[in-house]
Amino acid sequence: MRFFSVFDIVKNKANQLGYTETEMYAVLKNYNVNKKDLLAYKENGVIPTDKVLNGILSYLGMTKVELELKLGRIPAGLEDVFLNNTKEIAKILENKNSVKLNEFNSIQEIKPYFYTDLGKLYNGDCLELFKQVPDENVDTIFADPPFNLDKEYDEGVTDKNSFSGYLDWYYKWIDECIRVLKPGGSLFIYNIPKWNTYLSEYLNRKLNFRNWITVDMKFGLPIQNRLYPANYSLLYYVKGDKPKTFNVQRIPLQTCPHCGREIKDYGGYKNKMNPKGVTLSDVWSDIYPVRHSSSKNRKFNELSVKLLDRIITMSTNEGDVVLDPFGGSGTTFAVSEMLGRKWIGFELGNCEIIKERLKNKDKDKKLLGKVYEEKNKLFPNRVKELRKKNGLWIDDDFRQDHEGNSKGDKKNENNDQISLSLE
């Protein structure tokens, strides 16, 4: 396993010596390292300061250079040595390398738990199930992995892992995502910012960065001695120079719910505004968490239909393939079905919830219908009527001077032609 924290390296050494965690802390005291000192390096990749570092190095029986290499880093000040000795280093690595590429012809086919005309759902570990997917076979991947917060995601399915164990697992399935993506395919990773900082550093060496999207997390709980956590992060990367599909997404102008007046004053520019709405930015404040039981399909966390509709319509066209390695309640698959996308789904936990959801789509059709009441409109009908009532301008006042989209928008703004399976 790869190591990403000093704590995990120390713990691994203790395991090799047969120590319990309590015994490990007792032994470390002999090296002037107390429990509090070591725990400070449990959930990060920071290397300790001199006093603590010297004690840890003595316990591990290694130098600082060896410790940094153990963490997968080129030690500071030795970059030139590495660059000037790449051939020798490569020979050492190649002689040690015994990893074999997946040979799909020799892999036993796994039967899907459930399938429709558009997609297949598999029940099991995503790392095993990825082996069923050939190289460069998927147009878009959306992944909402466990956040490693010691939460229960399904009956008997929790996500507590060590710092290094979590990142090591994370990078393995990310590599599989990259393998199965088509050239120009899109990868979206939904997680808390802490983990996406590590992931973005890794992905920047493998894919083309497009956006770090901030998704407003409303009504979260405060954490002591920290800033109030108010967002999730959605990483958006592309395999290759540019996405093979990018459909412009537009949202309504922000208005007061009581009078309909716009929140921001656009002054003399209002007649130049696109009647299809405001171009979507990388801050999404209109995605509300699914918390009410009437909108949920299970008692655990669930993603918004609006979120998945936006991601899927932005990065795919009808008939394209969408993959989600952590199916959860099945929102990705339900939205893919309604948008006419093919899909591949993995889920380690209870797949029966997803199966029933896909067989009974009435609730999701209603939710998606509400999304499209506002999508690609400067003012939804209810807001437009409120503004007219209060004598405020509406886009119809300027439509004759604004012939639809601009030339640049027409090329990729085809969301009006999306065929929704809402009947």
Swiss-Prot record:
GO MF annotation, one: site-specific DNA-methyltransferase (adenine-specific) activity
UniProt-listed InterPro entries: DNA_methylase_N4/N6, DNA_methylase_N6_adenine_CS, N4/N6-MTase_EcoPI_Mod-like, SAM-dependent_MTases_sf
Region (Disordered): 397-423
Sorted UniProt keywords: DNA-binding, Methyltransferase, Restriction system, S-adenosyl-L-methionine, Transferase
GO cellular component terms, A-Z: cytoplasm
Temperature dependence: The protein is very stable, after 18 months at -20 degrees Celsius it retains 90% of its activity.
Residue ranges with Basic and acidic residues bias: 397-414
Keyword Nuclease: no
EC number: 2.1.1.113
Pfam families: N6_N4_Mtase (PF01555)
Reaction catalyzed: a 2'-deoxycytidine in DNA + S-adenosyl-L-methionine = an N(4)-methyl-2'-deoxycytidine in DNA + S-adenosyl-L-homocysteine + H(+)
GO biological process entries: DNA restriction-modification system; methylation
Xref: PANTHER family: RNA METHYLASE-RELATED (PTHR13370), TRNA (GUANINE(10)-N2)-METHYLTRANSFERASE HOMOLOG (PTHR13370:SF3)
UniProt similarity note: Belongs to the N(4)/N(6)-methyltransferase family.
Further remark: The protein sequnce was determined following expression in E.coli.
Protein name: Type II methyltransferase M.BamHI
Lineage, opening ranks: Bacteria, Bacillati, Bacillota, Bacilli, Bacillales
